[in-house]
Amino acid sequence: MKVNKKIGLKKQRLSENLPGFSSQKKMAVIKVNKLIQLAFKVPSNPKPSAVSIVLFPYKNDIGFFLTERTHTVDHHKGQISLPGGAQDTNETLLETSLRETKEEIGIDVDLELIGTLSSLYTPVSNFLIHPYVWYADSIPETTLNNNEVSNIFTIPLNDLLDNEIIVEMPKEIKGVIINVPCFHFRNCDCWGATAMLLSEFKDILKNL
């Protein structure tokens, strides 16, 4: 199937009802029960933020970028994430998505908005994350903001769709080592909030 047709199908699907938390919770750090589900309930004063899944043609497939955060950022130090960050005053969340993507990894090309995924509240940082899905006609050139990003990885969508890469790995959370569900990609391990967002995206892609 040609890339443009694939993108068209994704755009159509993202305009329909989304699976939301039922998909996100599959990659939650702690098994989701009623108590944990309350932890993901959005409070009255969350910090709005936006992240970007930037799709582009890649080796007869479609790829997207993940980043490794530095150990000097305020939240989620050293973790694998999507480019994005907190909303500034007087900007829309869509504008936040584009601005943060440019600031973190230097993407400064015209992007086509494909759609949005379900928002996700992260209790650890009090962020309410709004994911935007974009498309670039070719692989965008990137320049890392070394204050926020230490590395960037290109992930083929076919890898995301491979159930074999979902594993449990030991991670330290608040001084305690626990096994967490993780996307064990070829070049990085993605867990936590970003994995929860990608879990919904994966379920959407599987049903195209």
Predicted segments, located by residue:
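N-terminal leader/linker segments that precede catalytic domains of diphosphate-processing enzymes
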Residues: M1-S81, G85-I139, K171, V176-L208
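NUDIX/MutT-family hydrolases
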Residues: L144-H184
